């Protein structure tokens, strides 16, 4: 007979399988924002080259979003390596997190198509901020409920990176209103953020 306490928890494997599936779909859908341009009239190498040149913002949005999704997937994987079980609250934290993940193809496509305007940048950066917040809530809630096998160095690093990413996305959101076309480039700060988080391991 299953104990009532045990029935309130779920193995992490089922959630991780769902996460893998959602990420596979979201990362694949990104390419839909990069359609082959339709050219009316006569064709020439110059005209075709110009049409592809106009796709650079779309290509940038695709690559940026793909790499960010890869970072999120890897962070979630590393975090859940140390989580031994989940309850209903942690499950729904992840479900809402996945909702933000599946919106990325839309926000990335909007950014690529209308990146010089404020609203698409706001949508993309709010999308990123939501992902960062709920990724951090995973670690915060799991630690508070003692769901962690061991708070390893890697786990602590992921917590720091999640917090840092929230601030980067907030900064990018603020840039949306001033340096609109450049706001999304701030996510390059993830590179030094990871290096700093790694260095902090020797102090904490």
Residue ranges of predicted features:
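Multi-pass alpha-helical transmembrane bundle typical of ion/small-solute transporters
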Residues: 2-204
């Amino acid at each position: 007979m299953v104990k009532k306490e045990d029935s309130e928890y779920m193995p992490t494997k089922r959630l991780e399988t769902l996460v893998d599936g959602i990420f596979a779909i979201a990362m694949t859908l990104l390419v839909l924002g990069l359609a082959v341009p339709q050219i009316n009239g006569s064709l020439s190498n110059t005209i075709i080259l110009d049409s592809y040149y106009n796709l650079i913002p779309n290509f940038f949005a695709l690559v940026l979003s793909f790499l960010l999704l890869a970072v999120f997937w890897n962070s979630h994987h590393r975090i859940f390596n140390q989580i031994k079980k989940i309850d209903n609250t942690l499950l729904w934290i992840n479900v809402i997190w996945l909702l933000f993940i599946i919106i990325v193809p839309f926000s990335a496509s909007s950014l690529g198509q209308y990146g010089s305007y404020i609203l698409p940048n706001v949508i993309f950066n709010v999308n990123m901020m939501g992902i960062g917040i709920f990724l951090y809530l995973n670690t915060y809630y799991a630690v508070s409920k003692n769901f962690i096998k061991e708070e390893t160095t890697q786990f602590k690093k992921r917590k720091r990176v999640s917090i840092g990413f929230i601030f980067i996305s907030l900064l990018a959101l603020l840039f949306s209103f001033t340096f609109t076309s450049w706001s999304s480039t701030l996510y390059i700060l993830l590179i030094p953020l990871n290096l700093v988080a790694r260095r902090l391991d020797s102090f904490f």
